[in-house]
Amino acid sequence: LLQVKRIACREGWMIHMHVAQGDREIEQMLKRYGRRTPDFLDDLGLLDGGLLAVHLTEATDEEAALIARRGSRLALCSGSIGIIDGIVPPARAFRDAGGLVSLGSDQASGNNCSNIFTEMKLTALFNKIRFRDPEVMPAWEVLRMATIEGARAIGLGDEVGSLERGKQADLILVDLGAPNLTPVLDGPVRNIVPNLVYAASGHEVRTVMVAGQVLMRDRQVLTLNEGAIVAEAQEQAREVARRVAADPVHREMALLSAMEAGQL
């Protein structure tokens, strides 16, 4: 870890690291070092603005606040952690301590989709339910996590995350006339942001532009063969399933049995 830190400092890179991701990690840290992960990293000097701490699944509110105060950032993947662990990470404590939070979708096999609209909605709802408070994690806050604050958290705030002079032209065009996003009101109540966070699914995105290049127009992907990629992904998944079915180690996994039974 110290060597990684030296290289990152020398090259001006951030460190992307899963931190306090699960109870097994914490258990192993206590057995090996007598310290929980956040304290261990703090002792090594890794908790600073160069660390993107992913998940914080098992971090306490106090540990999350410590990481935030040190200047580290959080990559929050509400969907996958909710599905896999049934836990709401301490993003509220992290933000309350002044930390920057970025939203991530983790992995398709972990949350069943890579959809930032879904992550916005789940982040808002999970935290409202956890704290029994409808004012926790309002729509505008999670939208910022998905855009400008998320970009800042991963060290790209000067390049992307908002439409400003000098930044890269990354944008999407959303069909606000879609039934699930209607009506749109400007006053006395403005509902565009809540509609995007709570009602959008991503299918309302008509056009995608990255660095000024249009990658999708009117829902037609221009730079990739979408059909071929989907077909290949399906075939690769079948091959993985075949190998897992023949692997005696995987056959003993309770998680696999639960998935076969449709319990997840």
Model-derived features: positions:
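C-terminal regulatory/interaction regions
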Residues: 222-231, 235, 242, 248-264
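Short, acidic/turn-prone active-site loops that include or flank metal/cofactor-
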Residues: 21, 78-82, 107-109
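Histidine/acidic residue-rich metal-binding segments in metalloenzymes
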Residues: 1-73, 84-101, 118-121, 158
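C-terminal cap of metal-dependent C-N hydrolases
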Residues: 168-222, 230
